[in-house]
Regions:
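Conserved glycine-rich beta-strand-loop-beta hairpin in the small C-terminal domain of fold type I
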Residues: 270, 286-295, 306-319
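N-terminal small-domain helix-loop-helix segment of the aminotransferase-like
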Residues: 2-89, 96, 147, 272-275, ...
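PLP-dependent enzyme catalytic core of the Aspartate aminotransferase-like
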Residues: 78, 149-150, 330-343, 350-390
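Structural signature of PLP-dependent enzymes
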Residues: 249-255, 273-295
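Active-site phosphate-binding strand-loop segment of PLP-dependent enzymes
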Residues: 135-203
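Helix C-cap/helix->beta junction micro-motif
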Residues: 18-21, 125, 186-187
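Active-site PLP attachment segment
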Residues: 212-250
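Conserved PLP-anchoring active-site segment centered on the Schiff-base-forming lysine
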Residues: 100-122
Length: 390
């Protein structure tokens, strides 16, 4: 199995070398939120008083499963406790799911650009990605019946997408999700909604979810996580939710093989689900401000093509450069402006189609507004100087 280096992390050695030279790097390459984790998490850890830190149950601790169940009840979606499995982060959820539904040669339809680790999870299960290519000029939208059906063959097992989108920030409408659900139902495919950014939608609308459609309950799978929602990436708590009992049985085998998810992280994460909705209101306002800052600054750079993201905290942008990988390396090794430089995730690694995304980048707007403004200025200066010599 050959897997590519992560576009978010592969330039880390160059960044370390640049920092040793005294350069300050504005990191836009990884979606690590700087928003404070709610105190409820740490309070729950401090108040944990059992005399023995035992293994938790393999499917997850009841206190956390019930918290997740209530969260979806409040959204108007009922799941039984047995429909919910707790995982060690969203990454384990994706890995277990691919191992459960794919055979060697199986294919998963995924709109590209996509979260690069999907490639690793699918390849490790013997499958391949069947990409549905989107473009910045079309706003990276992909829920078109004719395009989806053109990719389906006898090896297709699932349609998988992130909603809101990573790396594009695209938010699917109810009608778009209905289209995907109908295609999945008619062709008996799993439809996998990776909804780890569901709280971060900036138009004021309620996020549509694949869990809304009762007629595809046997096909639908939701992947969720506390990492981004509660700014608790280090907690490593994820969720797989499906009403498909055969799939649940297969997933449970993997849960039992890895024994259990960390007890303390589950206890503390359960407390996060009691956080007041005002927390999310404040976080959304902050991310919307950051999005607007980045988007406005990018529009000022000649030759940049960018669409305002509707959700999550990422945006893709096409740059007037020949190769974003080469450009990023140059920014770290040969460029600075008053000792400052910038780091993003080159776009080619977010595509399965060879050559696609070569001049694109993903920006994670997870810095304070003033830092984002400086980072965008550095990007503009860098593009100008790079194109003078390349």
């Amino acid at each position: 199995m050959a897997c590519n280096l992560s576009p978010m992390r592969k330039f880390h050695p160059y960044a370390v070398a640049a920092e040793k030279q005294g350069k300050k790097i504005y990191h836009l390459n990884i979606g690590q939120p700087d928003i404070a984790t709610p105190p409820a998490y740490f309070d729950a850890v401090k108040n944990f008083e059992l005399p023995v830190l035992e293994y938790a149950a393999s499917p997850g601790m009841p206190i956390l499963i019930k918290a997740v169940q209530k969260y979806y009840e409040d959204l108007g979606i009922h799941y039984e406790e047995s429909d919910i499995l707790i995982t060690t982060g969203g990454s384990e959820a994706r890995q277990m799911l691919m191992l459960s539904i794919l055979d060697p040669g199986s294919e998963v339809i995924i709109p590209e650009p996509f979260y690069p680790n999907y490639n690793t999870f699918i390849k490790s299960a013997g499958g391949t990605i069947r990409p549905l290519t989107t473009t910045p000029e079309e706003g990276y939208r992909y829920a078109f019946r004719e395009k989806l059906e053109a990719l389906i063959n006898e090896n297709t097992r699932a349609i998988m997408f992130t909603n809101p989108g990573n790396p594009t920030g695209v938010v699917l409408t109810h009608d778009e999700l209905r289209t995907i659900a109908d295609v999945a139902k008619e062709h008996d495919l799993f439809v996998i909604g990776d909804e780890v950014y569901r709280e971060f939608v900036y138009g004021g609308e309620k996020l549509a979810t694949i869990g809304e459609f009762d007629d595809i309950s046997e096909n639908a799978v939701i992947i969720d996580s506390v990492s981004k929602r509660f700014s608790a990436c280090g907690a490593r708590i994820g969720t797989i939710i499906t009403r498909n009992k055969l799939l649940q049985q297969q997933l449970l085998k993997f849960c039992q093989a890895r024994l259990s998810v960390a007890t303390l992280d589950q206890v503390a994460s359960a407390a996060l689900y009691d956080v007041d909705s005002e927390y999310f209101d404040a976080v959304r306002r902050e991310y919307k401000l950051r999005r607007d800052t980045c988007y406005a600054k990018l529009l000022e750079i000649p030759g940049v093509v960018v669409t305002a993201p509707q959700g999550a905290f990422y945006m893709m942008a096409a740059l007037p450069v020949d190769n974003a990988d080469t450009f990023q390396q140059w920014l770290l090794t040969d460029f600075d402006d008053n000792g400052d430089t910038v780091m993003f995730a080159p776009g080619e690694g977010f595509y399965a189609t060879p050559g696609k995304g070569r001049n694109e980048i993903r920006i994670a707007y997870v810095l304070k507004q003033a830092d984002l403004e400086r980072a965008m200025d550095l990007l503009a200066i860098g593009i100008s100087k790079y194109n003078e010599t390349h």
